[in-house]
Structures are given as C-alpha cells and as structure tokens.
Amino acid sequence: MLFRSRVAVFAREWRRQQLESTHGASKHTYIPLQFSPGEAFQFDWSEDWAVIADERVKLQVAHCKLSYSHAFFVRAYPLQTHEMLFDAHYHAFTAWGGIPQRGIYDNMKTAVDKVKRGKQRDVNARFAAMVSHYLFDAEFCNPAAGWEKGQIEKNVQDARRRLWQKVPEMPSLTALNDWLAARCVALWHESTHPTEARTIQAALDDERPFLMPTGQPFDGFVAQTKRISPTSLLTFERTRY
C-alpha cells in the first residue's frame, strides 16, 4: 500500500509539472507569421527627438514596413493627426513603388472610433476613406497584442539605433524628412534580409511587381462651416484664428 501511495503521489506531481510546462509554452510561444510578396505592410507611431533650427524638438514618427521584403520607411511629424497619417502612407507607398493588399494596425484613435468584440471595429470615417482610395484592406490587432505586428514593433527599436542616434542637426522638418527618406533607402541596400541571404533592396525588387500602383495622393481634407465672431475670429480645434 505504501508503494502504491508513493506511485500515486509521483504520478500526480508529474502530471502537474507537465500541465504547467504546457500552459507556460502556450502562454509565451507564438508562431512566426509568413507573408507573400505584396501581401501586407505594418504601421505604427513612436515618439523621438531631433534638433531642428537649434531647438530640441519632440516628434511623432510614422513607421511603415513591408512584411515580405522588410523595406521600412520612417517620416516625422509634429502631431499624430489624420492629415499626417495620410501623408505618411503616401510617402511610404511612393518610396516602395506601390501598395500591398492589406495594412496591419493597432487600434490608434485616428483609425478606430471604437473597439468591439473580437476583430470587430467601428472604423473612423476619414481613415476608411483613405483605405478605400488606395484599395487596400485594413486589419486591426487585438488589444495589447503587439506580437501581431511584431515587425513594426521591432522597427521602432531598430530606428532609434540606425537613424535617431545618428541624425544631424537639421534646419527644418522638411530637411529632416528628406534625410530620413534617403537614409531608409540606403539602409535597404546595406541591410541583409532577416530570413534570406540577400539585401532588403533585393527582396523589395522581387516584391514590387506584386504591389498595386500608388496613383494620386488621398485628399483627406474636411470642409467645416464655422461661425465668425463680431471681432472677425473663428475657432478651430480650440484655437482662435
């Protein structure tokens, strides 16, 4: 009886350890995503700093990355507004030479008005208009699921090392963005693709035939009727003009 009791205790402990091991693996292990040429790009924002016209300025930085070739594009703005979001997409598409079939995003306020159950979203009307203009599909990650767009999450960290630590003082934001665009293209030629024995530029050359034409930039303006005050002032976004 004592022998059987010890065997039962051992069996229970072994099963417990196996369950903990299995649950731990399922909780922290993720299957890498594979992408076809022209299938997808990923987008995200970050905050970084640069010296512009002798002043250290905090910038909102748009990051775009093709999921197949890993060609990345970075552009800086003063704010994360719709107009700047639209501008970032157009410049990235132009640099890549076309548009993939879908874009992968988190639930940023300029794209999603309300996060619902599962993958259901109330998509912002202006963002939806941009997506319709460029003819790609928008896909949104689950909340707090950064691994679903892991490439662009990594690109934010890589950009700080490859770009922002080396950026010289600039006379203007336009000059900074010109420098960033040129540096991104140079890095495509210099950097090896993470899973293939070739450069990012070589992978992009193979991907470009699968991209849709960019066409005309999306005109994202919104017309609003405003009341002029007796002193000839109007209020827009809590600022008087």
Feature locations, PLM:
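Active-site beta-loop-alpha junctions of metal-dependent nucleic acid enzymes
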Residues: 74-102
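Short, conserved catalytic/metal-binding motifs centered on acidic residues
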Residues: 44, 70, 103-106, 131, ...
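Active-site-proximal acidic segments at structured loop/helix or strand boundaries
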Residues: 156-241
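RNase H-like two-metal-ion nuclease catalytic core shared by retroviral integrases
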Residues: 105-106, 117-118, 136-160, 176, ...
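Mobile-element integrase/transposase regions
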Residues: 5, 9, 13-72, 81-84, ...
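Acidic/histidine-rich, metal-coordinating catalytic segments
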Residues: 99-119
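Two-metal-ion acidic nuclease core segments, chiefly of the RNase H-like superfamily
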Residues: 119-138
